[in-house]
Amino acid sequence: MIKLKYNGHANISLTKDNVTILIDPFFTDNPVNKTNPNEVECDYILVSHAHFDHIGDAIDIAKRTGATIISTAEIANMAESKGCNSHGMNIGGKFNFEFGSVKVTQAIHSAGIEGGVACGFIIDFYAKTIYFAGDTALFGDIELIGRMNNIDYALLPIGDNFTMGPEEALEAVKMLKPNVVIPIHYDTWPPIAQSPQDFKKEVEKNCDAKVLIVDFNESIEI
């Protein structure tokens, strides 16, 4: 089984067989997080874009642990310039790692870094396919992501204001056709306050997918 921990916002960790991936490791100044970033251990860090609430503690954690930052070329180059191990990619690209593979997907959002783009990830982690959409608006080509991948778990933002909201996320589920949806990027601050329970009700009424609400700082097995 894979251990998934939700540290709030878009901060996720995946662990299996002593390999841990962190995604968008926003610990410091995250009002819903209870984890001390100085105690976090990991092997890889995926960063979807360079806004403070997504790149978060990536540089400090990578320096301390030796973890490899996997991100777009601009973020990877910046991380390397600060003394981190990094692996640069770009939208549409896929690369194999010890745990499986990472493919970089489109996300409609600002980048937070000069010359960069925001992105999402298709993560093949020990034979589970996990789609981390990143901060994104709804876009038509999300249907291609669903068509080309048998998605076990889709991690979708529902907060609105900065990303798609619950109504758009519902449409994304219809196009992606995942087995399970985990809502993220909500309730960190008042502008993105949402009811994941209402989202769950609408998705399960209109789609075949199940919605799994993971409480902040909770770990589950998937």
Predicted regions and their residues:
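Binuclear metal-ion centers of metallo-dependent hydrolases, dominated by the metallo-beta-lactamase
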Residues: 68, 80-93, 170, 174-222
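Active-site environment of divalent metal-dependent phosphoester hydrolases
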Residues: 29-30, 51-56, 76-78, 93-96, ...
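Pre-active-site segment of Zn-dependent metallo-hydrolases
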Residues: 13-51, 56-60, 74, 110-114, ...
